[in-house]
């Protein structure tokens, strides 16, 4: 028997499994108050998924408002769409716009790594499609458990194959990201996928419905049982030792070839002016798409749910309405354009069905074979869900953690000890080559990738006639954020900003994905609140806006949470990609190596402390956002005037790691001369922020120095590139061959996962 609105009104006391669906008692009672009766089974399913943590942001919303409060009108200049849309959109000049966003698919990627990661890519790509853009590239931020943990191989193998399999099939280059191993992610991997798309500004589309009588068309794949309760429920729960594998049926199944056709179909529909509003079907499926479209447009909607094409027999209305089957879109189309819309879909062999229409008023009415199974105000579903001011409390352990400095750890002193330290860090899972992973992705498909592997940021050509392009980088540091959430978020922002700047691009906008433990833990909420404020204040200092993002809570097993991991993505613009700066040394004979920025004795939270002593404590490096802004301006000017031939950001592993990576990328040796009054260990391995290694063509050294001095940016000569050498020499300390460095650097991941 179908539970209709009429039947629900006459059976107020019928027991309902609201708790099993994730609703609290008070939330369930609020639904009853809104409706003036008990909800039908379909309504209950809809409210449960739409009021879940993943869909409603009910624990984070009060803190996320700070992004809006700190965004000035000056920062909004050039932002065409921001927080609240499927993805942020920014003006990059010459009539072009870029849309980009990062989202999590963490929990599904643990339950079923291949499909979890693959559909994570598919979902973020559809968000970009829904803005009217052509997706042009993807990136990923991955966090796995310890490299030697038994389950890490299963998860990593599936996740990497899923990302590569879906992205490669779509013909989208993977232009960068990060892979981090830490035992805190055992059982709780992070899979954060970013997609970037390009559009002409006049082609921008938004997610709203308007115009009574306009038709609602569902197009794409058929609706099945896969993903019932999927991401919206999984991402709102923690894992226990036994429960993870039981959740397998809730993970969606992706078809990248269907999505590839869907991309081309959407672009032709946009070009024909056939779309009024559009929404992709992701978490919560059709229940989300219809309620959000109606709510955003302040209209009603009538949907005949039984007309939805299904690939499983005997599906209930609730299952059809809340299915998270992939590769589906929902469009608002004028009646006179329906035939043309359907004709385009037939051309691309995309299934399309008129399932309803926009109505006057404020009711979302869903019928099943003529009987009403949903009759609700859409705003109460999509935008007026519960909002919680969760208890926030600085953990009692925080003071002791910050007092536990790394200064007492034994440090290398002799040249042999420094050499051994370099090789130990380089040969650890933390700093080793990621080529074993990235070589499974296509980085250059479509022919517009200018920088990818070995680069601090991915660079894409947008306009072939002018050379206009973009740079993208994503960064995060859970270790720094654990020590100080406010500073940790700013350090992630600073590094992503710096990574974009070292290509010569001007940073213009930010996206984020905030990965934390349970919001029911006051200590986790303190970390979250501090990180949000740090990121928002940092963006205000740099004068670049947050255009959108994602929150992923409940990343913990039992009472043990992951390190707080705010992932920050920064978008930059290059007026001509021909002037981009790469990381490889040796493109000019006799390049001068210079270190920009100040180096301090800062090792708390460093990779050195982790690898050599398993230590995490103290305070993270200082962050100076004014210095970061100055660095970006200098690098942009140096790129434009061709004063710098290579540049590499300093972060984990410090100067030593940056030198090795740039030397290996250029397959050339170099000679390093550290200041005589400096501690070689500090100079080589400190992780002080705001620093960049640059290679300057010998004839330009004087001009470059003068530019840095005029702007007040410290610039120290630390060596030269030696194209006739096959080793790195640190004068008075040690020499190590490129062959030994490469073998150490590249052997680690194949040893664990090959």
Swiss-Prot record:
Binding-site residues for ATP, renumbered to this chain: 57, 101, 512, 549
Molecular function (Gene Ontology), one example: ATP binding
Reaction(s) catalysed (UniProt annotation): N(2)-formyl-N(1)-(5-phospho-beta-D-ribosyl)glycinamide + L-glutamine + ATP + H2O = 2-formamido-N(1)-(5-O-phospho-beta-D-ribosyl)acetamidine + L-glutamate + ADP + phosphate + H(+)
Residues that, per the record, bind Mg(2+) 2: 127, 280
Catalytic-site annotation from UniProt: 54, 105
EC number annotated for this UniProt entry: 6.3.5.3
Record bears the keyword Magnesium: yes
Annotated residues for binding of Mg(2+) 1: 103, 550
Any single Gene Ontology cellular-component annotation: cytoplasm
Region called Disordered, residue ranges: 386-412
Family membership: Belongs to the FGAMS family.
Subunit structure: Monomer. Part of the FGAM synthase complex composed of 1 PurL, 1 PurQ and 2 PurS subunits.
Protein's name according to its UniProt entry: Phosphoribosylformylglycinamidine synthase subunit PurL
Gene: purL
């Amino acid at each position: 028997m179908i539970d209709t609105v009429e039947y629900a009104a006459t059976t107020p006391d019928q027991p309902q499994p609201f708790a099993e669906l994730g609703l609290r008692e008070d939330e369930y009672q609020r639904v009853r108050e809104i409706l003036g009766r008990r909800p039908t089974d379909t309504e209950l399913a809809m409210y449960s998924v739409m009021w879940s943590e993943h869909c409603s942001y009910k624990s984070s919303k009060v803190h996320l408002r700070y992004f809006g409060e700190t965004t000035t009108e000056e920062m909004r200049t050039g932002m065409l769409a921001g927080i609240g849309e499927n993805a942020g959109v920014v003006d990059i000049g010459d009539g072009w716009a870029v849309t980009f966003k990062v989202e999590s698919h963490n929990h599904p990627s643990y339950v079923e790594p291949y499909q979890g990661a693959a559909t994570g890519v598919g979902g973020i790509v559809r968000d970009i499609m829904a803005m009217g853009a052509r997706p042009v590239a993807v990136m990923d931020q991955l966090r796995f458990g310890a490299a030697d943990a038994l389950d890490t191989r299963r998860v990593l193998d599936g996740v990497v194959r899923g990302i590569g399999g879906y992205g490669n099939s779509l013909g989208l280059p993977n232009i960068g990201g990060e892979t981090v191993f830490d035992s805190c992610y055992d059982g709780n991997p992070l899979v954060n996928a970013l997609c970037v798309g390009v559009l002409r500004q006049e082609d921008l589309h938004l997610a709203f419905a308007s115009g009574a009588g306009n038709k609602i068309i569902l197009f794409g794949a058929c609706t099945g049982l896969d993903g019932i309760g999927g991401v919206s429920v999984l991402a709102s729960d923690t894992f226990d030792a036994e429960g993870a594998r039981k959740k397998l049926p809730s993970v969606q199944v992706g078809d990248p070839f269907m999505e590839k056709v869907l991309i081309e179909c959407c672009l032709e529909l946009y070009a024909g002016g056939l779309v009024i509003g559009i929404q992709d079907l992701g978490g919560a499926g059709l229940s989300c798409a219809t309620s959000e479209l109606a709510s955003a447009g302040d209209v009603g909607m009538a949907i005949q749910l039984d007309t939805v094409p299904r690939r499983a027999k005997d599906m209930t209305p609730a299952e059809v309405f809340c299915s998270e089957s992939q590769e589906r879109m929902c469009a608002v189309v004028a009646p006179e354009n329906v035939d043309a819309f359907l004709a385009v879909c037939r051309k691309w062999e995309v299934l399309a069905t008129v399932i309803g229409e926009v109505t006057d008023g404020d009711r979302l009415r869903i019928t099943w074979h003529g009987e009403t199974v949903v009759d609700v105000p859409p705003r109460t579903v999509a935008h007026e869900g519960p909002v919680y001011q969760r208890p926030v409390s600085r953990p009692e352990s925080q003071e002791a953690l910050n007092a536990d400095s790394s200064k007492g750890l034994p440090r290398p002193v002799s040249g042999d000890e420094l050499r051994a330290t370099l090789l130990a860090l380089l040969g650890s899972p933390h700093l080793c080559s990621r080529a074993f992973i990235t070589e499974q992705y296509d980085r250059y498909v479509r022919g517009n990738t200018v920088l990818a592997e070995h680069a601090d940021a991915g660079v894409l050509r947008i306009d072939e006639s002018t050379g206009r392009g973009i740079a993208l980088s994503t960064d995060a540091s859970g270790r720094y954020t654990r020590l100080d959430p406010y500073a940790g978020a700013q350090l992630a922002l600073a590094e992503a900003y710096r990574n974009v700047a070292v290509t010569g691009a001007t940073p213009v906008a930010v996206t984020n994905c905030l990965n934390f433990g349970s919001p029911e833990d006051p200590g986790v909420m303190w970390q979250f609140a501090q990180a949000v404020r740090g990121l928002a204040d940092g963006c205000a200092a740099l004068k670049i806006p947050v255009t959108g993002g994602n929150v992923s809570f409940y990343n913990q097993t039992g009472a043990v949470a992951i390190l707080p991991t705010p992932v920050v993505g920064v978008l930059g613009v290059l007026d001509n990609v021909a002037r981009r700066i790469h990381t490889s040394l040796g493109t000019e004979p006799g390049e001068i190596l210079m270190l920009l920025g100040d180096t301090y004795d800062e090792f708390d939270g460093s990779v050195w402390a982790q690898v050599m002593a398993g230590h995490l404590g103290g305070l993270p490096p200082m962050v100076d956002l004014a210095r970061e802004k100055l660095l970006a301006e200098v690098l942009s000017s140096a790129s434009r005037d061709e004063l710098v031939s290579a540049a590499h950001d300093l972060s984990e592993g410090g100067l030593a790691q940056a030198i090795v990576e740039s030397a290996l990328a250029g397959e050339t040796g170099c000679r390093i001369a550290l200041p005589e009054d400096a501690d070689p260990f500090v100079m080589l391995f400190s992780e002080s922020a705001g620093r960049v290694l640059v290679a300057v063509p010998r004839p330009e050294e004087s001009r470059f120095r003068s530019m840095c001095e005029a702007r007040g940016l410290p610039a120290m000569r630390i060596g030269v590139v030696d194209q006739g050498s096959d080793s790195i020499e640190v004068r008075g300390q040690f020499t190590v061959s490129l062959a030994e460095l490469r073998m150490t650097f590249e052997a680690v991941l194949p040893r664990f996962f090959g």
